Amino acid sequence: MRQGSIKWWAQWHRAHHRYVDTGLDPYNARRGLFYSHLGWTIFRRHERDWDVDISDLENDPVVVWQDRYYYPLSLLACFGLPTMIPWLGWADWRGGLYFAGLCRMVVAYHSTFAVNSFAHWSGSQPFSKTTTARDNFIVGLIALGEGYHNFHHEFPTDYRNGVRWYDLDVSKWVILLLEQLQLATNLHKVSDEVIDSCRRQYRQEKQLPPADTFSADHGEVPPIEWDEYVQQAESGRGLVAIAGFVYDVSNFVDRHPGGEKILKTAMGRDATAMFHGGGHNHSLAASNILSTMLVYVIRGGGRVELLNKKEKQSQ
């Protein structure tokens, strides 16, 4: 489709999710419909402005190879083959170049751009209003399912966009087929309980504080001393402290939308500020997912990272 290499596209997509609706968002919908649809291709933001972890991409041999040879590969796939096949088959290279090459590329471009623009401009928001992302059925038709964008922004690691069985999400069905053919692995699917909880809380407009939201469904949580929490984290256990609670994120590290690096830096620390806007202002859905990983409550409420830094500076 000639929309950038895997590495380029994934980096911009991750930046969009991390900085959504802010000045660092590459497709910032708050700058207007034109900017989010086409303007960003003209007034491009350089990748150096972002703090986005792409170490997994840089260590993937397929991604590295495709990025290195992206231009000849894209020219061959987007123009070479569409021109050559009609030329060899029925002597119509002009029709192949125009319809299968140029026209197809224009349609594909605007179908994808519609997700950045119209799916942030018009539609329903069944999961959250914290971002401009919306579920737009028309965009879903055009972009083969990508229009269920409110769900995608709330649950960015889920391979689905249309979560209901009757949602028109061709991308989801193709990915499932690829899994059956063993061409796709490690598909992540958010549990129905977490999705229903997010939808229910949003409908009831109960934006509970982190401690209440996280502990409501867990009954008695065993206490732990701050030093013991730090010791366990330093010994290799994936523990993160947020608002006086400790979460075991060991099985979530490789699925963290912001990348492994930023989550690992939070281990053994008070990550309250990071979770609530310092690193990324996480959604209600993220809070619900986090609540399933609760393992301890810190005795006395824990440490505040800012005060901890001041103590170290004074020593």
Task: Give names to the regions the model predicted.
Residues 61-70, 121-134:
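Interhelical loop and helix-boundary elements at the membrane-water interface
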Residues 1, 135-147, 206-211:
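Cytosolic juxtamembrane regulatory segments of multi-pass membrane proteins
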Residues 226, 238-239, 245, 249-255, ...:
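Non-catalytic interaction/regulatory modules that flank or connect domains
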Residues 7-23, 115-129, 140-159:
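Histidine-centered catalytic micro-motifs
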Residues 129-132, 138-139, 165:
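Short Gly/Pro-enriched turn/cap motifs at secondary-structure boundaries
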Residues 1-113, 158-239, 275-315:
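Non-catalytic, topology-defining segments of multipass membrane proteins
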Residues 139-140, 240-242:
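Conserved, well-structured core segments
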